[in-house]
Amino acid sequence: MRLFKQLERWKIRRQINQSIIDVIFRLRDRLAHYWQADVNTPQVDFMLLHIACSLGRIERGGCVSSLYSEMLEEMQSAVIFPQVLAIHQDLLKLMPFSIPEAEQTYFLANIHSLVLEQKQLKPLK
């Protein structure tokens, strides 16, 4: 499994720790079992690796700059954005600590790509 191997490499380099790996696999399970995502795709691996990097960075006191506002506005105006936001808010509940808004913009971008790629995701009610 590509995802697990990369997470283990980052753990050895002390970029992340075991608690972050545990969170990533909880997120993966939530995507698979609740949102009905196919979690065996490069897109999901990319998203989860990005989240792992972000959590490690936050634990070390760092934070990225926000996604370009034009890109964020384009995502927010998309017809799929309510579903993107619902998934985002659901996954945030599984995070071990507060995620800065700037980091969240990239989470939204990754989830946006996921929703575009996977039409079988659980629909909003």
UniProtKB/Swiss-Prot annotation:
GO BP annotations listed: regulation of DNA-templated transcription
Pfam families named in the record: PRD
Coiled-coil residue windows: none
Name by which UniProt lists this protein: Uncharacterized protein HI_0487
PRD domain residues: 15-121
SUPFAM superfamilies (alphabetical): PTS-regulatory domain, PRD
Protein origin, superkingdom: Bacteria
